[in-house]
Amino acid sequence: QGFYSQAEMREFIAYAAEEVGLDGSDDIAADYSAAGVDVIAVLQQDMTGYNGSVEDLALISDYTHPDLTAFLGELLDTYQPDLLWTTTTCGYACSDHAPWTSRGYRAAFSFESRFGDYNPEIHSIDDTVATLGGSAAHAAKFARLAVAFLVETTLDGSGLFSDGFETG
């Protein structure tokens, strides 16, 4: 017995042109919406390498779907119980989750820190791996969250996802 139906598809999408107005994600979300593509959930991960807060990561709570954000919290509590996490707000449509949310898709966004504590070298000449302490350890926490998200959203009624999230 497999974890997923072949009728369902999982996609990993990398966007271009975020910094000039979310153009890449907006184009893809618009195309999916126009084609009536049934998307059960979108997980956005942006800026995952810098640990600027006491907490290990933050879940963005504005311009996101509240139930999906709560689901990410459940995943963190279940699969990374020693991890400290919090919620935070951007105050605007700050990343590629926003075009999905604005079209009625459920999107959630995990971020490297509280919003005001992100990498101070962002978009500068000093925005290098050295700023991250030469390690991807912080980003690995997000990779584990993404794997938990992928697995739990493919389970058929036997995981956290069986609590009714998939039906709204």
Residue ranges of predicted features:
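Active-site-adjacent substrate-binding region
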Residues: 53-157
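Active-site donor-binding loop signature of nucleotide-sugar glycosyltransferases
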Residues: 47, 112, 167
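Conserved beta-strand positions that form and line the central face of beta-propeller blades
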Residues: 27, 121, 164
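Acidic/histidine-rich catalytic neighborhood of metal-dependent amide-processing enzymes
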Residues: 1-67, 71
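Extracellular carbohydrate-recognition regions
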Residues: 158-168
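Aromatic-residue hotspot detector
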Residues: 12-15, 100, 165
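A residue-level signal for beta-strand positions that form part of recognition/binding surfaces
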Residues: 9, 107, 162
